[in-house]
Design a protein with these regions (language model features):
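Short glycine-/aliphatic-rich beta-strand segments at the starts of folded cytosolic domains
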Residues: 50-59
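Low-complexity, acidic Ser/Thr/Pro-rich repeat tracts that form intrinsically disordered stalk/linker regions
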Residues: 5-48
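Subtilisin-like serine protease catalytic core
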Residues: 66, 159-282, 294-297, 325-326
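Structural detector of well-ordered beta-strand residues that form the stable sheet scaffold
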Residues: 119, 267, 330-332
Length: 335
């Protein structure tokens, strides 16, 4: 909720708007200040010899094997005896790799023919604690009779007045994981699910990192931990509750805890490390890459990233979002 402006102030200029996939370097946060989102580290901030994760995007026409061979030559040219090891491959929403290589080889990798972009991986911190002093926040009035623990998202958003309750729809929550045994998800699905155990099993061979993802229930037809590379997508730590919170608002379906679309299914893509809660770019991109195969109707990304496309990392995400849009998937990314 934005704080009111004094009456004498002039209205702000209209926000810039660009098509999905284009890059707008002028975007700022809602306060008008540049976001403090972690930027991709630069080579002068990291020991050049330190082996780090480098995310690489290839041109669409590039040959994957030939490009990797050229990248290895480039790395060895800067650090003799070293090579780039493939950690992950992307081939659906993005054509590229996540590689482990010396940080100081970044510029050499960028110069390889067929490489369109490359950056040192970021790790986004997760903080689930908000205060009244947070950007744009003000205290909302509360009636004495209100029980905030039992407020329905449907009533808050007037979604209870709609006849559609998410029937036949699939929402992917790419977040810190979801506590799928939480009572908020204990209701009965009242419509024929779009994803069944059989259909998910049929899609699995086409998936990238999530090949061993699991079908949990009609409510949760697919779950995978892309950060730790295992099928346990349950959250860890206090900040890990964020994904469960988001999923409950989105599609909770039990008693007084009702989400906006209670009959929708939820794909759980955990992208936060269990060890420290950080969200690495390589895991997030792997989850997004698999969504081209799983084809949810909507992806929810509430990770606090800025929409300001001001570096190679964010430009790469713009490419991914455009690919998902072309696949018929709506991406809702909160800044």
């Amino acid at each position: 909720i934005a704080a009111p402006r004094p009456a004498e102030s002039s209205p702000p200029p209209p926000a810039s708007s660009v098509p999905v996939g284009d890059v707008d370097t002028a975007l700022t946060s809602k306060s008008g200040q540049n976001s403090q989102e972690p930027q991709a580290p630069t080579t002068d901030q990291v020991d050049p010899a330190a082996v780090v994760t480098i995310v690489v995007q290839l041109d669409e026409a590039a040959d994957r094997a030939a490009s990797l061979a050229s990248i290895n030559e480039a790395v060895a040219g800067v650090f003799p005896g070293s090579s780039a090891q493939v950690e992950r491959e992307y081939d659906k929403a993005l054509k590229g790799f996540a590689l482990s290589a010396p940080a100081g080889s970044l510029d050499a990798i960028r110069a390889v023919s067929g490489v369109s972009a490359a950056f040192l991986e970021r790790e986004i911190p997760v903080n689930d604690t908000a205060t009244l002093n947070d950007e744009g926040g003000i205290e909302a009035p509360r009636l004495a009779s209100q029980n905030p623990d039992n407020l329905s998202a449907q009533l808050i958003m007037h979604a209870d007045q709609l006849t559609q309750k998410g029937e036949g729809k699939v929402i992917a929550v790419i977040d810190t994981g979801v506590e799928m045994t939480h009572p908020a998800f204990s209701g009965t699905m009242r419509s024929t699910p779009a994803l069944t155990a059989e259909s998910v099993a049929a899609l699995a061979p086409r998936l990238g990192a999530g090949k061993t993802g699991v079908y949990v229930s009609e409510k949760f037809p697919f779950a995978y931990d892309y950060a730790d590379n295992d099928p346990d997508a349950s959250p860890t730590g206090e900040a890990g509750s964020h994904g469960t919170h988001v999923a409950g608002i989105t599609a909770g379906n039990a008693g007084e805890i009702v989400g906006i679309a209670p009959d929708a299914q939820i794909i759980v893509a955990k992208v936060a490390r269990s060890s420290n809660g950080g969200i690495p770019d390589s895991a997030l991109l792997a989850a997004l890459d698999d969504m081209v195969v799983l084809r949810p109707d909507v992806i929810n990304l509430s990770l606090g990233q800025t929409g300001g496309m001001d570096n190679e990392a964010d430009s790469m995400y713009a490419t991914v979002f455009k690919s998902l849009q072309q696949a018929g998937v709506t991406v809702n990314a909160a800044a």
